[in-house]
Amino acid sequence: PLMMDDLDLLSTPVNYISYRVRSLDKKQHDVQMYVETTPQLAINELTQPTRSKVIRRNGINYVQAGTIDQPILGRKGDGICIDWGYAYLAGNIGANTAVSLGNYYGMKNEFATKGTLLPTQAECVTRRADQMPAMAYTDNLGKVGADGKSGFLMLGYDDISAIEYFYQPRMAYWKHDGKVTIFDAFERAKANYASVMERCRVYDQMILNDAEKAGGKEYSELCALAYRQVIAAHKLFKDADGNLLFFSKENNSNGCINTVDLTYPSAPLFLAYNPELQKGMMTSIF
């Protein structure tokens, strides 16, 4: 969820994956949902050793994955991926939902043939790309008719330190200088799912309405497409003096950060919906 009027929510690195299924032929169908990822989310090179493990905590099952070395803020430049911090696949603990860590091919085969996951490994250490395990989630929705059934899981990333600013490592805004953990963030996301999704629907409609008034229906659709792209690849944090900073990061253009050629074209969105974010872009320039 990326609502610019809620800085905690904007900066929290927890995503919802929502799903809903319904029968189109008016018959009942037996349905199981399967989602997976791998530790590749948390590495820069396929040869990097990784450690993954299953965590069960406060009503949520997690599969956590990250590099063994954890070179925090150790890379810079273009064409690179984060290889510090931890990726998380998370789902509610329930009678019909499960997460599992296990063999990449075996996990899919188990689901395809039986509709279930392999019994989970508690921990998995890899040294090569071909050892990468599956981090899997399933929801046994049972018999599904025309009325449908729905659910959600969560995917998140704790980068530990978000940015080095004038030789000081800084945490992301949502951490509030270490007072909030990634598990706090997941638990809050789980508890607030329904209300946050409703807020997102209202916010989406506001963006569409405002843009249509300004430039017509096609313009509003373009703005809806651009909204997440404009906000993506930014880090929201505070400096040592408590100033709010909101920096963009170029992924494949010299590896620069907070460059004005990105700040200028993105400015209208932030000026319209949260000028504090625009100030966060400009503070370090002036």
Which residues make up each language-model segment?
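Short helix/strand-bridging catalytic loops that position acidic/His residues to coordinate divalent metals
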Residues: 2-3, 266
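Short, solvent-exposed loop/turn segments enriched in Ser/Thr/Gly
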Residues: 11-16
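Acidic/polar, glycine-enriched structural segments that form the non-catalytic walls/loops
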Residues: 3-9, 20-258, 275, 279
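Carboxylate/His-rich catalytic cores and anion/metal-binding grooves
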Residues: 263-286
